[in-house]
Amino acid sequence: MSVPPGSIIVSDWHRCPDSREFFSKILHKKRRRKFGLLEAPMMPPQMNVDLVRYKVFLSGKTGVGKSALAARLAGLDLPKMHYETTGIETTVVFWPVRLKESGRVLFFRFELWDCGESAMRRFDHMLLSCKEKVDAILFLFSFTDRGSFDDLTNQISRITEPSDRVVKLVVGTKFDLFMHTDVTESDVTHFQEVWGLPVFRVGGDVSAGLGEVAPLLNALAENLWHQDCMAASSVSISPQAALRETSSEIIV
């Protein structure tokens, strides 16, 4: 089960005045900065901020909008035309959050992995590479493609095991094209009741800024942090030491 929104981090913190100096590090002229695989936001030396890294795999049928979602979450220009990803593409997304209990600020670094469906069918190692040391999986479907929604259960069963320690969230794309929807709200509600997974909705061609991506990025951050804290407590590590030994660093 997922963590209730706002139970661990401050919801809508991106709207609060005290978040501006942190969000300014991922913005340039009111647009999101583009970060390469080896880049990170620059912070003043006196402001020690913990950076936590996570690998996130985007799963879904061809045409549901995996590449578009990655671009949207990173604040990049959305693809003007559809093309199938020929191999594996990675996109880096930085997102600051404030923990409710301690007031501590964390910078999350999400490395989004997107692989074309045809490539995964042709080369078995593609899926294995995407799943290797993965922390979270976003299962995508399109509101305009009933088949992609019906395929969700197959995706989840094929890609994950009940014993996997991985955060699972579902994203419905092209939600703004309601005139052409093939998936009803009752369908979504029934799916959530059966699988216990939250479903997030994103639009099609137009990006609406931080407010549009905040619910999904906050949910990713909240569930991943909770997962790590639970894992740490199971081996008697204090929550303050829950920063991942192999993937945490201080931004300077």
From Swiss-Prot:
Instruction: List the Pfam families hit by this protein, alphabetically.
Output: Ras
GO MF annotation terms: GTP binding; GTPase activity
Matching PROSITE patterns, A to Z? RAB
Signal peptide extent: none
Any one annotated GO CC term: ciliary basal body
Q: Which UniProt keywords apply?
A: Cell projection, Cilium, Cilium biogenesis/degradation, Cytoplasm, Cytoskeleton, Exocytosis, GTP-binding, Nucleotide-binding, Protein transport, Transport
Region feature (Small GTPase-like): 46-252
* Highest taxon of source: Eukaryota
- Cell location: Cytoplasm, Cytoskeleton, Cilium basal body
Fetch the InterPro entries from UniProt.
Answer: P-loop_NTPase, RSG1, Small_GTPase
GO BP terms in the entry: cilium assembly; exocytosis; protein localization; protein transport; regulation of exocytosis; regulation of vesicle fusion
Chain positions recorded as GTP binding sites: T62, G63, V64, G65, K66, S67, T173, K174, F175, D176
Q: What is the stated purpose of this protein?
A: Potential effector of the planar cell polarity signaling pathway. Plays a role in targeted membrane trafficking most probably at the level of vesicle fusion with membranes. Involved in cilium biogenesis by regulating the transport of cargo proteins to the basal body and to the apical tips of cilia. More generally involved in exocytosis in secretory cells.
Q: Which family does it belong to?
A: Belongs to the small GTPase superfamily. Rab family.
Q: What is this protein called?
A: Ciliogenesis and planar polarity effector 2
- Give the organism the record lists: Danio rerio (Zebrafish)
